[in-house]
Amino acid sequence: MESNNGIILRVAEANSTDPGMSRVRLDESSRRLLDAEIGDVVEIEKVRKTVGRVYRARPEDENKGIVRIDSVMRNNCGASIGDKVKVRKVRTEIAKKVTLAPIIRKDQRLKFGEGIEEYVQRALIRRPMLEQDNISVPGLTLAGQTGLLFKVVKTLPSKVPVEIGEETKIEIREEPASEVLEEVSRISYEDIGGLSEQLGKIREMIELPLKHPELFERLGITPPKGVILYGPPGTGKTLIARAVANESGANFLSINGPEIMSKYYGQSEQKLREIFSKAEETAPSIIFIDEIDSIAPKREEVQGEVERRVVAQLLTLMDGMKERGHVIVIGATNRIDAIDPALRRPGRFDREIEIGVPDRNGRKEILMIHTRNMPLGMSEEEKNKFLEEMADYTYGFVGADLAALVRESAMNALRRYLPEIDLDKPIPTEILEKMVVTEDDFKNALKSIEPSSLREVMVEVPNVHWDDIGGLEDVKREIKETVELPLLKPDVFKRLGIRPSKGFLLYGPPGVGKTLLAKAVATESNANFISIKGPEVLSKWVGESEKAIREIFKKAKQVAPAIVFLDEIDSIAPRRGTTSDSGVTERIVNQLLTSLDGIEVMNGVVVIGATNRPDIMDPALLRAGRFDKLIYIPPPDKEARLSILKVHTKNMPLAPDVDLNDIAQRTEGYVGADLENLCREAGMNAYRENPDATSVSQKNFLDALKTIRPSVDEEVIKFYRTLSETMSKSVSERRKQLQDQGLYL
């Protein structure tokens, strides 16, 4: 919308690469209305004015009438996300002098090293600004903040838009600007990565009632009173609550669950009443209750009277909130099922939003945020590629783990530069400028940072691709359609109205590549890979084995997309009524059945079982809806054996006389594991012949054939072929045929 001498646009959050850079993202139509080119300077006005440089908007922003600016610029002009601002093109002058003051607490003092003015002048070159703006200087950070902010105290010339030039003199005052730290170290939406969907839901639930209660009045509905954020520790629940409070301009009151509890009668309830009373007096307010499960547990399960009284007090306070819409309660917990059910109903906590473990793209966004002010010594394109690689390595990491990883990487870099630094003197600017954090610093940090959400259940990061598996082309195609497609393209299934398979069973002789196939699926579909090994699950304590299965499926849901791999599933899920182990395996089978049936709500979780003996498995597991597909992995034929040999010799220096075709011909009955062993033994034969050998000859392979024998003979192949034919029949036909053959089902 055009206004005299400017246009009116709606404020949206900045791109993840923009915070602290004074960038203004405008679409082509807005630039045309302003007669502005990329690189021009525009003024943004709401309560106050600020300036920034024009950058190209995302293609999806075209004709939406929005302007993307970061939280510093929003704070400078007094606007929030969703507000309308006036944007106009302005001319800047090169500043002769700019005076800056750090924005820190009044009782703090910063001691800058020599040459700080030159460093700041170079870091801010061509940066547009106005007097009284807050600006961020790349590379300068304060502990606990994403970046150190400065107040533009004075510019010469004054009261006009200026930019820093080569000749601009920078003066930095050591005394802080007259700001409170809470106001400026504000956590904004740009500081939250990988949670855009959840953030959208929370903003709709919280920001709208706080900023525009008239919308709810017009529709004749009452705004929500509360939201519970739940998920593993470190995923960003508290961060979201603070960001929402900051961006909505609401007063933020925090209650840390355990701190509210008191041994004196009635004191815990009194503390709660005081906080709710203060929230209503200073509305609009957000009351944030961290670890809400510690003060509002299920009343029937607690021994103490205090907890029961606190829960009752919280219920009456939430029911009695007068300023509905002006006071919102946000609870955070990682134990949602431990909260009293009376709180978990509409009218109290209206919504429950899961803040889960971030996926690969989410991890990249979080890493972008935490490395925003970090000197990585690489171009934007290289940084982008590197952070994508780091996102691949960090399966199962939550936001707090990624922050710890970045911090540890910086400490690794610091340790490299410490010998050059005299800690008793100010650090010279040239040392500060040459400090960079390298890829090796990150990779070394990865060795010491363990993902917190998966410490109980280790999620493997497979690195097996389809090309690493020789042969089995039909099986690979079937698995891709069954597993990979639903994980990579869920929209196809939604469009065609198909429900993806929940799981499938791979069966065949030992060594044919069942585990390898499962790992390849996880790698190619970018899914987490959780392996359940039978003996690790079994426990002598009643209920512990079932609990282990439940926890694994719960973790799979948290780190989805995930593949749960049950290796040797026949050892933990044999046919019920055939074992004498006091019912442990029967209970495990029952738990598996209920877990598999519960996968309807587990989007992005696929279960793969592997076994050599599907005939002794419990038949209830083999029906559609649990293991939807039974896939037979046959021993490799000649073509498949050749393909497997090529895979295992691709990094092996072969002599010219090596004929893999001939070796494939000679290895009838060899499975994938045998062929891998054969190649290894051939390499060892080459070493035994000559420790300085540079290649492996045909003779080495033929000698290896004398010691490495096939795992599968004609009798085994016949057994599995019969089994494969039987497994493809109906349950009644299958049972009869297996009983006739002396097997059972």
From Swiss-Prot:
GO terms for cellular component: cytoplasm; intracellular membrane-bounded organelle
Family: Belongs to the AAA ATPase family. CDC48 subfamily.
An example Gene Ontology molecular-function term: ATP binding
Subunit structure: Homohexamer. Forms a ring-shaped particle.
Classification via Gene3D superfamilies: 1.10.8.60, 2.40.40.20, 3.10.330.10, P-loop containing nucleotide triphosphate hydrolases
Thermal response of activity: Optimum temperature is 70 degrees Celsius.
InterPro entries from the UniProt entry: AAA+_ATPase, AAA_ATPase_CDC48, AAA_ATPase_domain, AAA_lid_3, Asp_de-COase-like_dom_sf, ATPase_AAA_core, ATPase_AAA_CS, Cdc48_dom2
Signal peptide segment: none
Keywords: ATP-binding, Nucleotide-binding, Repeat
Binding site residues for ATP: 231-238, 508-515
Designated name of the protein: VCP-like ATPase
Pfam families: AAA, AAA_lid_3, CDC48_2, CDC48_N
